[in-house]
């Protein structure tokens, strides 16, 4: 499999570096808000960490920040970072972060109203990182590097997340998103929502890969 870092461009390094700084900064500040909020509420720091790591936005942005860091560093990394530079992994992150932005804007922005610095972090995680990372994917993944089987990581990542959220909800009784809240809408509705989101992920991944593959013929 081709490695984007084998022939890095200045544009990839610059954009990846920008995304790494933006992503990690927003994630760290958001973690601080979550932990301190739950300490204030008497739930404790561990509960704050649990709530923080329950959001697909956070996990996907963490993956994107890791990929961006690996691309920014290029060959100056150890083997674990090499995995994050694989075209299939970059593509999985791109599909997920694109849908993070779209789903938040369409379904969640009217029920989420952060203020101050937390609002700035929200803008970074939901509105800046998604388009910038998709652009990074487009210029970082070499032409001809992707085949259709490379979409499996893009589908596996949200599928594993859905199982994680449902298992965590059974144990802790908390769900990060209303469309996954079994206690309010029941398992039947949650499964229908999961099926619908799965179809969206599959369609998005297929369209993105088709566009990327079509660019090789130009």
List the model feature ranges, each with a label.
Residues 34-39, 105-114:
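Juxtamembrane "helix-exit" motif on the non-cytosolic side of transmembrane helices
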Residues 56-59, 118-131, 191-195:
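Membrane-interface loop-to-helix entry segments
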Residues 78-96, 147-155:
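Interfacial segments of alpha-helical transmembrane regions
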Residues 3-19, 215:
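N-terminal membrane topogenic signal
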Residues 130-146:
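Alpha-helical transmembrane segments in multipass membrane proteins, preferentially the mid-helix core
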Residues 44-51, 85-86, 112-125, 148-150, ...:
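Non-cytosolic membrane-interface motifs at loop->transmembrane helix junctions
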Residues 21-38:
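Alpha-helical transmembrane segments of multi-pass membrane proteins
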Residues 11, 51-54, 172-207:
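Membrane-interface transmembrane-helix boundary segments in multi-pass integral membrane proteins
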């Amino acid at each position: 499999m081709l490695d984007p870092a084998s022939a890095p461009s200045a544009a990839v390094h610059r954009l990846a570096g920008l995304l790494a700084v933006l992503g990690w900064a927003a994630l760290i500040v958001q973690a601080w808000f979550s932990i301190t909020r739950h300490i204030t509420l008497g739930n404790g720091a561990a509960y704050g960490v649990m709530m923080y790591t329950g959001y697909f936005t956070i996990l996907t942005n963490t993956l994107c920040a890791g990929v961006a860091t690996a691309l920014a560093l290029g060959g100056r990394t150890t083997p674990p970072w090499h995995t994050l530079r694989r075209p299939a992994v970059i593509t999985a992150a791109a599909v997920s972060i694109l849908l993070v932005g779209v789903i938040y804007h369409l379904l969640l922005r009217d029920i989420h109203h952060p203020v101050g610095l937390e609002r700035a972090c929200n803008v970074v995680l939901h509105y800046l990182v998604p388009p910038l990372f998709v652009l990074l994917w487009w210029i970082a993944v070499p032409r001809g590097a992707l085949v259709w089987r490379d979409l499996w990581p893009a589908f596996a990542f949200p599928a594993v997340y859905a199982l994680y959220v449902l298992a965590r909800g059974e144990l802790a009784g908390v769900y990060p998103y209303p469309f996954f809240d079994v206690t309010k809408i029941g398992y039947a509705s949650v499964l229908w929502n999961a099926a619908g989101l799965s179809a969206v992920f599959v369609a998005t991944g297929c369209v993105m890969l088709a566009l990327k593959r079509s660019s090789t013929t130009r």
